[in-house]
Amino acid sequence: MSGILDTVNLRTQMVGQNRLELLLFSLETDQVYGINVFKVREVLQCPELTEVPRQTTSVKGLAHIRGETIPVLDLSEAVGRMPIPKEDHRQCFLIVAEYNTRTLAFLVRKVDRILNTQWDQIMAPPAEIGVENYLTAVFEFEDKLIEILDVEQILADIYPMHTKVSEALATPEMKVKAKAHHVLCVDDSSVARKQMQRSLEDLGVKVTTCNNGKVAWDMLNNLAEKGNDVTELFLMMISDIEMPEMDGYTLAAMIREDPRMHTMHIVLHSSLSGGFNVSMVKKVGADGFLAKFNADDLASVVIERIKKVEQRS
């Protein structure tokens, strides 16, 4: 028990310090990949899977783990690589993770180690590879290029998310009010940025997107240096937590420490839900936490903010 508590305490101390832990793994080649440990519930040898008729190709079946039935995705096949042969499944591993309030297991060939590093060592993918890919970040380790997959993009291709805001929320009256407001959305996942932008524009809000915390901070800082009141320019900022170069915790903490923008309304948005994130959001001074992704939940947070601002004016 003391070991578990030590791990929790270590991760708690990492919050706001731009640090992260990555679980390294490989698929059907020598390429090494990483996944944020915060998203991982457990790693185990692949058990026998129950096949599901007429399922998506990359969904290999269901695993029964600790009384829970969890869908298993062949991560290699999901990203367009060779699938792991069925006869090899029992020699492979499952990474059980939580994304967008959904518990899934990713089938991988090997699991290597947990690496403690810093977000400012994690870089956005090279622009030359284009936008149609499953990478969200890369970093160098022991002369190797480690790739961090955009799991949200992978899951969106398998389980498409609805971005339409319900008519009960996106009323004609609210759309008129929303047109006067501008929301800053920060996320390293291209699919997450598109989801937020589509939903908020459906509501009527103007949207600016940034692909990581550093890009957002540089933009806000430049605006402030030019004499702009960013808290007047933006109704609020909705930011992912896990991002290359600067994470959402650090971005929120830096905004709170800057007298030019410290009153900005900040909501942190993550595919990893749970009490841990909620408590850490409070620690760095954010105003709220929102689990990914539900269009109406996102719209409700923005509508609530619009109403509060209008009450004060």
Predicted regions and their residues:
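An acidic, low-aromatic, low-complexity terminal/linker signal
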Residues: 1-237, 241-250, 257, 262, ...
